[in-house]
Amino acid sequence: MTLSKAGVLLIIVLALASTLPAQTQTLTVLHNFTNLPDGGRPAGRLLLDPDGNLFGTTTIGGKIGYGSVFKVDASGNLSIFYSFAGPPDGNDPVSGLIRDAAGNLYGTTAHGGTTTVCGTDQPSWAGCGIVYKLDPSGTETVLHRFGSNGPDGGFPNGPLALDSSGTLWGSTQVGGEAGCTIPIPPNGRMVDVGCGTVFKVDASGIESVVHSFTKVDGAAPIGGVVQDQALNLYGVTLTGGLQNCPHAFFGSCGTVFKLDTSGQFSTFYSFKGGDGGPDGDIPESSLILDPAGNLYGTTNAGGSVQCDPIHLPGISCGTIFQLTPAGEETVLYSFGGSEAAGFPTNGLVRDAAGNFYGLVSGLVLKLDSMGKESILYTFTGYDIIASGDLVQDAAGNLYGTTYYGANGKGTVFKLTTPPDFAVAAFALSPASVPAGGSATAPLDIITVSGFNDAVRFTCSVSPKPAQSPQCSVTATAGTPATVTVSTSGPSVRVPSRSGASFSYAMWLPLLGLVGIGGLGSKKRKVKAMLLGCALCLGFASLVACGGGSISSGNRGTPTGAYTITVTGTSSVATGSLVRSTSAILQVQ
């Protein structure tokens, strides 16, 4: 038995009726587990292969009783791909699977490998787990057996990552450096189980510990690791880090860690404890990445909403968070509002349109790209204990498992999702213009789940000073739409002239010229002087009367950065879906 998630924070399944209207989606149960011989109580994220087959694990049952790896083909037929046998094989495979290009599967079991009790006096904790490989025929190879709470770690419970050299990366919840003492049931005896590790297993099967946690930099890593395009590894620790969460083990709030390509470990983010505030704490799900390198995950507590002030005072309901590649965190959503859900323990899946889907409190939730939540499906009975993370196919269908349900041994299900779209990100060309210049960009939409509707585009500019940029969207059937942003250039204004004063100012030098012309030619110097005086007097009169002043008029679009937001609306008559995206235009 691993460190229970419920041991860190009492997990309450909220049985409240939701005040949000549930969307009509179709759920199909693909298989009801019976324990023997097919397995029971599935856990971990399902794996979807290129042929549409699903692979997953059950923590009990199978042909021998120690858990199984199962396969559900594209027609919905389930078969047992492998049954665990217990030590020296593994048992209790709680993590999901990964697949290499050759079709081999890799995973971990939380227990088994050896018959040695793993760090406690509980026989059920025999063996610290294994790393295994299954070839396409279902033949197993044990790549590594973890020691008895030793320096190499124990209780791996999250998915692995596989790099291009064939090296596997993962984490163990205990083992490694000493310093993490927990109470062990049934008598609560305190045992130092170690703070957990990050490990690797190379292509030849040699395991090495890359980092041992110290509680200060995190403890009890959970959810495995993910790898970005630059080959950096990321994961979460259930606790450790900042001492600001009295409801968690060690009073710590949890962390997100990073391991770069040189092997350098760093605490990427330390949760601050957000009960009644914006931040979350106690992350216990796997992370996911988007194409831009942003990380997303959930926290089991924290956020801005308290779920049960009477029974759990001061404990908020959890969050969905984002971390940029620079380590800047944003809470995208706080649980516990109108959707009557909280304390998420599962991770997320994100579609191409930027929508998130997850299992929490017996609900399948959607958080759209605009940050609005909706309920896609509400489980009933034992099915409310959903296990593992969802996975999505190219058509937008979601697949997942429930831990109990049906025969009390769990199910595999498929759920349709509603059609949706997103306005694709755009970049203006040029991105910087002088006042009076213009920029354009092609627009497109990203569709998911069979979206097939007309989209009407509008655009807006912020801020909006006098002479702010103007934007418009043009579209021709069958071609991408175009957004055009134009700015105003400076202009010069010459004020109007008063008729009488202007006439006086003009006649004065003319009369002077006539008078001067009557003087003799011998008085040329005097004539020149008088002519100059007349011209100066006339010009002075012209300016004084407003006839010759020149002032600045329209100064054009002020310099600065402007946010250009394009909004797409589908089903124009009802306004059912509104999606937007933005770009920056710099005016020099």
Give, region by region, the residue ranges found by the protein language model.
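Extracellular beta-propeller repeat domains
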Residues: 2-423, 435
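Long beta-sheet-rich domains in secretory-pathway and surface-associated proteins
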Residues: 418-588
